[in-house]
Amino acid sequence: MRKFLYRLDAIGNFKCLLLPVLAAVGLLHARISGQNVVLGLERAQILGEIDYTALVRWLAMMTLPLLINGFYISRCRRIELFSILRFQKRESWLEQMMLGCIFITVCYAVLLVLPLFFSHPVQVILSAWILLMLNMLLWTELLLLLNIVFPKASWTGIMCAAIICAVHVVGEQFPIISQWLPTSWGIYCRTDMVSANGASVLFCAAANLGAIEIVGAFGAAVLRYVKRRDYE
């Protein structure tokens, strides 16, 4: 574990990211507009109405790990050749990069829910953390896929953020389909534990896992294609 953390720090210089991350977590927990966005965004009382203040804070929460992972991936890309020579094969380097992104995302999700222990029951915190973590892992996997498909692109993080925003806004405009959209699967306050019309926590968790599996399978297929192309 210590060796793995040392690699993370050496590649990404994560000590310099600690302060802005903590500041962002504090801002997200501030009850601006009466909402703690860590538990998600409540449904609008009026059809099509969007609380843009809460939406911006929620998007900041969801996209921050993507930005951190994007920074980590870019640092990994800089030492790609050295890492491949060290690990003897490209798959080991990719696995190390993916594990690093997963580690960052899980730690970030834990950091988000820790302050909730002062104000919410353990069951609520665990349910919110599981949904939030799985949903963030889904978007992180999409980020990794985009970086595999477009290895030299610098806009993959921005594209992920734009996708999250677009999908959520579509769900707000058409509530009848919102529970089938991936942005809703990480929002605890829209589950049946809080909302009478919400989907179950189990459904949201299963939907996140299913989507992660689909994106992962597609990513594996892309990697196989790239490998065959390189050999040819």
Question: What are these language model-derived features?
Answer:
Residues 9-12, 34, 87:
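Terminal domain-start segments
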